[in-house]
Amino acid sequence: SLWATPDQYVHACYSDIPSLYGERELDDDRWSYSSTTNAVEYPVLTGTVMWFFARVIPSGENEMLNYYRVNQIFLAGLFLFIAFIVYRIRPEFAYLSAIAPAAIASLYINWDLWAIISMMLSIYWFDRKKYTHSALAIGISISTKFLPIFLLLPIALILWRRNEIKELARYLGITVATFLLFNVPVM
């Protein structure tokens, strides 16, 4: 296996993607959350992405590598789309997201970009006062990674400062409902 030696750490090329493919039994046609002892520790939408890509790759000698490559392709596409969203939000800063060393270095470590893209869409729509779209996107983002839950605080403060209390309650309600929609069936 390409990631089975200590070299993955020495050469700074660790990735959860191939590691968890075998460790979480995705290579055995198992649903990400079916094991009571070895389930995926990621939130439900990330686990679904992991499971889906494990299903679409051809089985055979290079399964793990194929799994990694399919994920690489989609993560690269997400990275480019995130740069486009940043361009739509603030054109003068778009190049910064596209060449950010931390983003590039961590591009293929795990599936975080699936959460980042929905979080960026949430910011984009919030900025345009499309609160329903924004709340749906942040609910999806939280179902993909728990970090985006912290975006709710500044959103709540902005709506509170604008005295849009009903909109704040509606926003939080849509976010929670979206989160529950994806998570309750897996609980």
Region locations from a protein language model:
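Transmembrane-helix signature of polytopic, membrane-embedded enzymes
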Residues: 62-65, 83-102, 133
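Membrane-interface helix-boundary motifs at transmembrane edges
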Residues: 87-91, 128-129, 160-168
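Alpha-helical transmembrane segments of multipass membrane proteins
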Residues: 46, 174, 178-182, 186
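Specific aromatic-rich, kink-prone transmembrane helix
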Residues: 115-131
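Short acidic/glycine- and proline-prone juxtamembrane loop motifs at membrane-interface regions
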Residues: 107-115
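Membrane-interface alpha helices of multi-pass inner-membrane proteins
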Residues: 101-106, 122-123, 132-156, 178-181
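TM-lumen/periplasm interface segments of multi-pass membrane proteins
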Residues: 1-87
